[in-house]
């Protein structure tokens, strides 16, 4: 068989060379007619001349004395070769204008040419054939046809494609349908019916690749045809609307300063419409951007929803905008099969407010300085401020309160404390500030009961002034009786306040009443020589703790002179 085939090849090459110089209408390589088939499956290929390039069919051409010749060029080769029609079991054969492969092999890939000619006429066209492998899930580099089904709208059928002519109508092949790798059996809304696959009310979940495998018997040999297609569920025609422009809109204003970058997006929604040509474009002052003397950049992008609704965006940008650019009219346009829409962008020059940086800084600094000064003044002179307020706006506590004394003085009965109370405290509080003091040893009558008179004096007083010293805390003294009575009166009735003056430091407080009093009351400390000056902090603290009382007895100068002279002798 090898020798005859070689002789035939040489004869064919001779024919091709003998006609090489003759005129032949060569339609070239028709890449649009590329044919893809699976390995080890039959392929049936018609000569494209009679389908797209010539006005007559094969029967007419044959009866006119024209001969159809087939040859091919192997993949990655340049040499044209005759097709071997003498392979075992007629694996490759020709029937009229059809070239048959039963089945294909990977090395059948190449460019195939069909030539129609006689002694006076010649016409030929080439087309590529690609034999591809498939895996167990029918995945392959093949370009898949797409079937679009309207969402939730009636019953849709798809048919296993490109199987006509492979077997006579008397043969009933078996057909198995798959979605991806899964055979379609008892699916919710998908039902196979032979060559057809029915979708009952399609849903987005039906999106995917569907494969039909057709099996038939020919001349005792079993052949398989595998056809895969993509199903996409798309928006219903009843939901089709004209374009909707998201941006620009009336709510957004593009304010820019000259020299800044201006960026305006034209973002448009298109509902799915079969075979609709969706487009968007900009106009500037009614002209195309290319016709305007402005350096404009336009970038377009497209995204799709699960039902193939489309969102298309064109971003218009001007790197450095000028005042003239900010006065132009920028309009976004959109069009689909349902209608058109347009929306102008609001662009204006930003108004720059006057900058008061120096003034604001000075004002802020002055405010901070004033606050700091006020805090310092209050911290240093708060006693003077309280006394000033009491002197001019305070309410006299002595009016109609039924009290006879302003202060009851409680102290330890020894020479040092008595001298401090009788000379220093009494001298300033009575003579300087005009308060009326109750000093038990001075104001009590002889022969009276000490306990009763002490309680009576305390009840008649507005304040209880306790002079603390180590001798004060000794158990069983009259001073402790006075302290307990004052604290009890303050706690139960609230008509007396206790003032603690520390004459000398007390290290160990064993009296619980005194401990409790020191923990909740402010202690005014006597600091010896430092505290003798009548305008000092000690006397101001003590005066703040005293009852508010109007006493015009002394002028300021008299008070100062008397206090200082009286204290100097203490």
UniProtKB/Swiss-Prot annotation:
One Gene Ontology term, aspect cellular component: synapse
Catalyses which reaction(s): NAD(+) + H2O = ADP-D-ribose + nicotinamide + H(+)
Signal peptide (residue range): 1-20
Domain (Ig-like C2-type): residue spans on this chain: 21-128, 141-230, 243-348
Residues exposed to the Cytoplasmic side: 389-570
Active site: 482
Main location group: membrane
Region (Essential for interaction with PTPRD): 69-85
UniProt topological domain (Extracellular) ranges: 21-367
Enzyme class: hydrolase
Top-level taxonomic group: Eukaryota
One GO molecular-function entry: interleukin-1 receptor binding
Positions annotated with a glycan in the UniProt record: 57, 107, 111, 118, 157, 196, 209
GO annotation, biological process: cytokine-mediated signaling pathway; inflammatory response; interleukin-1-mediated signaling pathway; interleukin-33-mediated signaling pathway; positive regulation of interleukin-13 production; positive regulation of interleukin-4 production; positive regulation of interleukin-5 production; positive regulation of interleukin-6 production
CDD domains associated with the record: Ig1_IL1R_like, Ig3_IL1RAP
SUPFAM superfamilies: Immunoglobulin, Toll/Interleukin receptor TIR domain
Membrane-traversing stretches: 368-388
EC number: 3.2.2.6
Distribution of this protein across tissues and organs: Highly expressed in hypothalamus, in the dentate gyrus of hippocampus, cerebral cortex, cerebellum, liver and lung.
Domain TIR: residue ranges: 403-546
Disordered, as annotated region: 550-570
Similarity annotation: Belongs to the interleukin-1 receptor family.
Known partners and oligomeric status: The interleukin-36 receptor complex is a heterodimer of IL1RL2 and IL1RAP; the association is inhibited by IL36RN. The interleukin-1 receptor complex is a heterodimer of IL1R1 and IL1RAP. Associates with IL1R2 to form a non-signaling interleukin-1 receptor complex. Interacts with IL-33-bound IL1RL1 to form the minimal interleukin-33 signaling complex with a 1:1:1 stoichiometry. Interacts with KIT (independently of stimulation with KITLG/SCF). A mast cell-specific KITLG/SCF-induced interleukin-33 signaling complex contains IL1RL1, IL1RAP, KIT and MYD88.
Function: Coreceptor for IL1RL2 in the IL-36 signaling system. Coreceptor with IL1R1 in the IL-1 signaling system. Associates with IL1R1 bound to IL1B to form the high affinity interleukin-1 receptor complex which mediates interleukin-1-dependent activation of NF-kappa-B and other pathways. Signaling involves the recruitment of adapter molecules such as TOLLIP, MYD88, and IRAK1 or IRAK2 via the respective TIR domains of the receptor/coreceptor subunits. Recruits TOLLIP to the signaling complex.
Domain notes from UniProt: The TIR domain mediates NAD(+) hydrolase (NADase) activity. Self-association of TIR domains is required for NADase activity.
Descriptive protein name: Interleukin-1 receptor accessory protein
């Amino acid at each position: 068989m090898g020798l005859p085939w070689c002789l035939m090849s040489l004869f064919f090459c001779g024919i091709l060379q003998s006609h090489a110089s003759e005129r032949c209408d060569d339609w070239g390589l028709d890449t649009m007619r590329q044919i893809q088939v699976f390995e080890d499956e039959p392929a049936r290929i018609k000569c494209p001349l009679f389908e797209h390039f010539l006005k007559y069919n094969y029967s007419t051409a044959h009866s006119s004395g024209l001969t159809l010749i087939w040859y091919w060029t192997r993949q990655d080769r340049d040499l044209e070769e005759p097709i071997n029609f003498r392979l075992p079991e007629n694996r490759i054969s020709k029937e009229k204008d059809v070239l048959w492969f039963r089945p294909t092999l990977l090395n059948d890939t190449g460019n195939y040419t069909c030539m129609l000619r006689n002694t006076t006429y010649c016409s030929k066209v080439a087309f590529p054939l690609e034999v591809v492998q498939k895996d167990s899930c029918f995945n392959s580099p093949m370009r898949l046809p797409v079937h679009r089904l309207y969402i939730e709208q009636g019953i849709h059928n798809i048919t296993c494609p490109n199987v006509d002519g492979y077997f006579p109508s008397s043969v009933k092949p078996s057909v198995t349908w798959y979605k991806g790798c899964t055979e379609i059996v008892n699916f919710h809304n998908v039902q196979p019916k032979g060559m057809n696959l029915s979708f009952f009310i399609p849903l987005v979940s039906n999106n995917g690749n569907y494969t039909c495998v057709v099996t038939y018997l020919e001349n005792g040999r079993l052949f398989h045809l595998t056809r895969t297609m993509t199903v996409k569920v798309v928006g219903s025609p009843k939901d089709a609307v004209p374009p909707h422009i998201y941006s620009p809109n009336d709510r957004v204003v593009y304010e820019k300063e000259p020299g800044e970058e201006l960026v305006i997006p034209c973002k448009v929604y298109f509902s799915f419409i079969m075979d609709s040509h969706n487009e968007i474009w900009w106009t500037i002052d009614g002209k195309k951007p290319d016709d305007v003397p402005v350096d404009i950049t336009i970038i377009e992008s497209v995204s799709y929803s699960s039902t193939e609704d489309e969102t298309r965006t064109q971003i218009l940008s001007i790197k450095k905008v000028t005042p003239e650019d900010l006065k132009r009219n920028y309009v976004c346009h959109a069009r689909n099969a349902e209608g058109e829409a347009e929306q102008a962008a609001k662009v204006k020059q930003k108004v720059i407010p006057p900058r008061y940086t120096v003034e604001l800084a000075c004002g802020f600094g002055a405010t901070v300085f004033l606050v700091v000064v006020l805090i310092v003044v209050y911290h240093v002179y708060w006693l003077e401020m309280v006394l000033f307020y009491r002197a001019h706006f305070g309410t006299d506590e002595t009016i109609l309160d039924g009290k006879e004394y302003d202060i009851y003085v409680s102290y330890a009965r020894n020479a040092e404390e008595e001298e401090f109370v009788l000379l220093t405290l009494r001298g300033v509080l009575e003579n300087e500030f005009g308060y009326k003091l109750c000093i038990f040893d001075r104001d009590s009558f002889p022969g009276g009961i000490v306990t009763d008179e002490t309680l009576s004096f305390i009840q008649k007083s507005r304040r209880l002034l306790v002079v603390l010293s180590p001798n004060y805390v000794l158990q069983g003294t009259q001073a402790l009786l006075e302290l307990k009575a004052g604290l009890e009166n303050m706690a139960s009735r609230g008509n007396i306040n206790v003032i603690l003056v520390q004459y000398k430091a007390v290290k160990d407080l064993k009296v619980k009443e005194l401990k409790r009093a020191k923990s909740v009351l402010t202690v005014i400390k006597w600091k010896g020589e430092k505290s003798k000056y009548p305008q000092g902090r000690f006397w101001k603290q003590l005066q703040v703790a005293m009852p508010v009382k109007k006493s015009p007895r002394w002028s300021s100068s008299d008070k100062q002179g008397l206090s200082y002279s009286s204290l100097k002798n203490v």
